[in-house]
């Protein structure tokens, strides 16, 4: 049954909804239930007409708190998606309690991002936003960041509301959007969970993001920047900024090429500061050597009492290193904590032992002006279709 305890779900059913008749046949419970709090449409593909009807129905759900619009446009053309998204978000904008929005795995690109930007800049209730794998790129990504910065001003009005969760991964945000994102984080400084993995951000962009943006978010509990390229410059910046986030529960920087020296700097920062709540530490594939893991083991012993998961696979020390054994003994004594399987450890080459993977601070696109990406004012027209009146349509089908 689709509706259950104020939840309506079509999640993962693989429906291809084209006509009004097809849509209305599967949303009867959604229409009839007055107190819907959560709607899950993910894993289906919706036409423009389907989204128009759904948008009008969603508009009536005044208790709505959570919507999942992930993966709802598979097989839809680039011309369809902007109009379909506009209908959905237009309806959602009337739901004054809707604080959690999932929009991942939809090919918005630059064109379909326009109705998204318009929605994000003015949906005051927004607290949790999930926006991963949307093909934004640096230009549209910067516009999304500026929309959230604009939203912060609206949310500051009494009574204040704050964005708490931002997940924006696999969107090719790159260095060119980092100043916009930094401004966003300065404005949205009550964030507790930030995940931006796999965005092609290089070391200069990482430095901008950490130094001038995320440093303002003193309440951070989760920071995930996995699979971006830190190298030594980014690792130095992370180590320097780490004390700004005393409430961290999860720090995820696997696949970031921290480098041997960078790994030691990060481990030392963990040792020098008490992260009493840190439970998850992801450090895979970062070139961390036996000296780095030795410092890390000391940190776990003295300043990281709550660690439950430590990921170290793919680094350049032996799985039987005495520091690894020390960490395992600490976890055993505490009766909590686990190290991942160290089954893909790297060997330290002669080149690695004599050279650090780093770059001068004026390299890596630092000569580019990252300020020249401006947010465009969005005025996205709704394509009106003659003869379509949703209220009349619903009355005719005896569903209202």
Predicted regions and their residues:
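Leucine-rich tandem repeat or coiled-coil scaffolds
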Residues: 1-400
């Amino acid at each position: 049954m689709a509706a259950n305890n104020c939840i309506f779900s079509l999640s993962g059913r693989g429906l291809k909804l084209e006509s009004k008749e097809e849509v209305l046949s599967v949303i009867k419970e959604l229409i009839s239930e007055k107190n819907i709090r959560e709607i899950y449409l993910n894993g289906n593909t919706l036409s423009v007409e389907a989204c128009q009807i759904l948008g009008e129905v969603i508009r009536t759900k005044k208790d709505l708190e959570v919507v999942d619009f992930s993966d709802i446009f598979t097989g839809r053309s680039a011309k369809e998606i902007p109009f379909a998204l506009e209908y959905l978000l237009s309806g959602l904008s009337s739901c004054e309690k809707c604080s959690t929005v999932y929009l991942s795995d939809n090919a918005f690109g630059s064109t379909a991002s326009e109705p998204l930007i318009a929605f994000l800049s003015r949906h005051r209730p927004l607290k949790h936003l999930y926006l991963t794998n949307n093909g934004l790129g640096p230009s549209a990504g910067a516009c999304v960041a500026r929309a959230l910065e604009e939203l912060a001003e609206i949310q500051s009005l009494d009574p204040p509301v704050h964005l708490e969760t931002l997940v924006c991964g696999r969107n090719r945000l790159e260095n060119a959007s980092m100043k916009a994102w930094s401004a966003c984080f300065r404005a949205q400084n009550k964030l507790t969970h930030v995940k931006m993995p796999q965005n092609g951000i290089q070391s200069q962009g990482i430095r901008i993001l950490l130094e001038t943006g995320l440093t303002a978010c003193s309440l951070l509990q989760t920071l995930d920047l996995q699979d971006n390229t830190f190298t030594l410059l980014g690792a130095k910046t992370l180590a320097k900024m780490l004390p700004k986030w005393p409430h961290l529960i999860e720090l995820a920087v696997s696949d970031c090429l921290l480098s041997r020296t960078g790994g030691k700097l990060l481990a030392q920062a963990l040792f020098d500061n008490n992260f009493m709540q840190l439970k998850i530490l992801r450090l895979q594939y970062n070139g961390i050597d036996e000296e780095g893991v030795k410092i890390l083991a000391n940190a776990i012993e003295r300043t990281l009492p709550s660690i439950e998961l430590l990921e170290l696979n793919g680094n350049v020390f032996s799985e039987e290193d005495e520091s690894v054994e020390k960490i395992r003994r600490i976890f055993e004594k505490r009766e909590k904590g686990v190290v991942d399987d160290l089954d893909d450890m790297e060997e330290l080459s002669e080149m690695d032992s004599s050279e650090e993977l780093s770059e001068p601070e004026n390299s890596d696109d630092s000569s580019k002006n990252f300020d020249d990406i401006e947010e465009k004012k969005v005025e996205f027209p709704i394509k009106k279709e003659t003869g379509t009146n949703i209220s009349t349509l619903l009355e005719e089908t005896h569903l209202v």
